[in-house]
């Protein structure tokens, strides 16, 4: 079973509390999502392999460490996942970015896929799927399904807020996928929203209804 890690760093929790507030502006919400994603990146990327490299300082030659030549890809689930991309890219700027577009049918609560645009060598990359919320788990499962159909095997899911129902569903569907979240909330309401949650992340990111 893939691991579930709740990143409880004080800075992340402080910023997440502001993110949740109803009176947080679109501008502030967007900035906070970016900042939290970057802060989470330190833990999400903790296990990247290192290799020795010889460098020359102003004083002498020395053997130091650098990230090994592991190919990375960040794949946001559109549209809200876009808000997390730059924060992670600031840490690993050489990573490629793919896109998986989905919308949720408000009657069935099921995700509908409308776009898949990925690097050609996605099957060779370590992939970080990003979406601010893991609610029912439907979108996350469908995104991982799409990636695995294209040969991907090393996949991690990164979100800001999650519900126990979504975590359980993703773990059952894809037990090899690790999940990183800034918060594990209480439950889903009758409309499939996370409680206490933060509302509709896409609408709050882009100022839409």
From Swiss-Prot:
Enzyme Commission code: 2.4.2.9
NCBIfam families this protein is in? PRK00129.1, upp
The UniProt function text for this chain reads: Catalyzes the conversion of uracil and 5-phospho-alpha-D-ribose 1-diphosphate (PRPP) to UMP and diphosphate.
Cofactor comment text: Binds 1 Mg(2+) ion per subunit. The magnesium is bound as Mg-PRPP.
**Chain residues that bind 5-phospho-alpha-D-ribose 1-diphosphate:** 79, 104, 131-139, 200
Q: Which organism is it from?
A: Streptococcus gordonii (strain Challis / ATCC 35105 / BCRC 15272 / CH1 / DL1 / V288)
Could you identify this protein by its name? Answer: Uracil phosphoribosyltransferase
- Superkingdom is Bacteria
What GO molecular function terms would the record report?
A: GTP binding; magnesium ion binding; uracil phosphoribosyltransferase activity
Q: What UniProt keywords apply to this chain's record, in alphabetical order?
A: Allosteric enzyme, Glycosyltransferase, GTP-binding, Magnesium, Nucleotide-binding, Transferase
Instruction: Enumerate the InterPro entries for this protein.
Output: PRibTrfase_dom, PRTase-like, Upp_B, UPRTase/APRTase, Ura_phspho_trans
The residues that hold uracil are 194, 199-201
Concerning its family, UniProt says: Belongs to the UPRTase family.
What reaction gets catalysed by this protein?
Answer: UMP + diphosphate = 5-phospho-alpha-D-ribose 1-diphosphate + uracil
Please give the pathway this protein is involved in: Pyrimidine metabolism; UMP biosynthesis via salvage pathway; UMP from uracil: step 1/1
Do you know which Gene3D superfamilies this protein is assigned to? 3.40.50.2020
EC supergroup of this enzyme: transferase
Per its Swiss-Prot or TrEMBL record, what regulates the activity? Allosterically activated by GTP.
Gene Ontology terms: biological process: UMP salvage; uracil salvage
Cofactor field = Mg(2+)
